[in-house]
């Protein structure tokens, strides 16, 4: 089970948002590269970056911070990034800079042709982030709920060659209310590609529950507010997950 620390970037700083609201942000660090190194040293085997300004602007914004993170840890562990990725040129620039995976969210739903092209051009590097509430997909930084069923869309994306799906339950994100295991497993069972859980990770109990369903196709979990608030000791949690995976 991959525990993937999230570094959310806003105006060059590491922040956490509550329920995806840019006006409800808490700053956790002024130096994103140092934060990346901290998590790598704590045993992270992948990092999850979000360009928050980029997600809302529809184009990359925190380039300097992303570059600094890749320079710091990019040679040691794979880094994945989402937020504001809307064209193939942006993907190419990021991959050339050392990014392992590019996460396409809103654009995958609104512009499926772009996702198809991205999978053709950069096979093995494309992850789709699906944000959902009650099984329906949301877009535009969660501000718009669509009529699309998560499972239907994910199956289509799988057929196009997407590497994996990050599934976020937006009713829970940033709330420390526990991962929606049931919905995550339901999605994973419907697919042959891995699913990464996200949204609401509260503590070690969630990690233990996720390890129980790892064989259903749940590959990892994004660790956000819980590792910054102190509700989850990241190094201890990854160690516990490894123990359970070996059991």
Curated annotation (Swiss-Prot):
It comes from the Bacteria. The active site is at 8 (proton acceptor), 131 (proton donor). GO terms for biological process: L-histidine biosynthetic process; L-tryptophan biosynthetic process. GO terms for molecular function: 1-(5-phosphoribosyl)-5-[(5-phosphoribosylamino)methylideneamino]imidazole-4-carboxamide isomerase activity. CDD domains: HisA. The keyword Manganese does not apply. Keywords: Amino-acid biosynthesis, Cytoplasm, Histidine biosynthesis, Isomerase. Its main location: cytoplasm. It is an enzyme of class 5 (isomerase). The keyword Cytoplasm applies. Its EC number is 5.3.1.16. It catalyses: 1-(5-phospho-beta-D-ribosyl)-5-[(5-phospho-beta-D-ribosylamino)methylideneamino]imidazole-4-carboxamide = 5-[(5-phospho-1-deoxy-D-ribulos-1-ylimino)methylamino]-1-(5-phospho-beta-D-ribosyl)imidazole-4-carboxamide. It is found in: Cytoplasm. GO terms for cellular component: cytoplasm. Pathway: Amino-acid biosynthesis; L-histidine biosynthesis; L-histidine from 5-phospho-alpha-D-ribose 1-diphosphate: step 4/9. Belongs to the HisA/HisF family. HAMAP family: HisA. This is 1-(5-phosphoribosyl)-5-[(5-phosphoribosylamino)methylideneamino] imidazole-4-carboxamide isomerase. It comes from Acidovorax ebreus (strain TPSY).
């Amino acid at each position: 089970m991959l525990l993937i620390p999230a570094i959310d970037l806003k105006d060059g700083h590491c922040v956490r948002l509550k329920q995806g609201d840019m006006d409800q942000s808490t700053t956790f660090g002024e130096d994103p590269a140092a934060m990346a190194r901290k998590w790598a040293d704590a045993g992270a085997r992948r990092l999850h970056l979000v360009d928050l300004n980029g997600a809302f602007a529809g184009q990359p914004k925190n380039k300097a911070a992303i570059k600094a993170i890749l320079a710091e840890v990019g040679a040691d562990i794979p880094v994945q990034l989402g937020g504001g990725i809307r064209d193939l040129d942006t993907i190419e620039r990021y991959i050339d800079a050392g990014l392992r995976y590019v996460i396409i969210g809103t654009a995958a739903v609104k512009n499926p042709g772009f996702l198809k092209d991205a999978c053709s051009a950069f096979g093995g590097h494309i992850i789709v982030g699906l944000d959902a509430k009650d099984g329906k997909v949301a877009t535009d930084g969660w501000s718009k709920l669509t009529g699309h069923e998560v499972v239907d869309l994910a199956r289509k994306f799988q057929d196009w060659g997407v590497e994996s799906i990050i599934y976020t339950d937006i009713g829970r994100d940033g709330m420390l209310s526990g991962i929606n295991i049931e919905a995550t497993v339901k999605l994973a069972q419907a697919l042959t590609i891995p699913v990464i859980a996200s949204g609401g990770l509260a503590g070690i109990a969630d990690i233990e529950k996720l390890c129980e369903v790892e064989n259903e196709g749940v590959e990892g979990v994004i660790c956000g507010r819980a590792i910054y608030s102190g509700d989850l000791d990241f190094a201890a949690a990854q160690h516990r997950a490894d123990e359970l995976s070996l059991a």
